[in-house]
C-alpha cells in the first residue's frame, strides 16, 4: 500500500509551498503510523512522486518502481470507469510559474 498524501490547499500553495508539501508528507506518515525507512516513497495528490533511499541510485530505483505501480493503479481505475482527479488552476499556475515565471526560483538554471 503506497502512502498517498492529500493535496495542498490554496493557502498552502500560496504560502511556503515547498515546506507545506513536505508537511503533508509528514502528516500522512504520522496519520498512518508509517516508518519512512519501510516506505521509501510517497505520492502527493496532484504532484509527482517523492522517493528516497540509502543512495541516489536506490532513490531512483524506488522512483521507477513507484511510477510503475502508480501507472498500474491509474490504468485499473480508468478501466473500472473511475474519473481522474483534475488539477486546480492555482496549483497548475504555481507549478508553471515557479519554474518559468518572471520570478522563477525552482529548477535548473540556464
PLM feature segments, named:
Residues 1-110:
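Glycine-rich flexible loops
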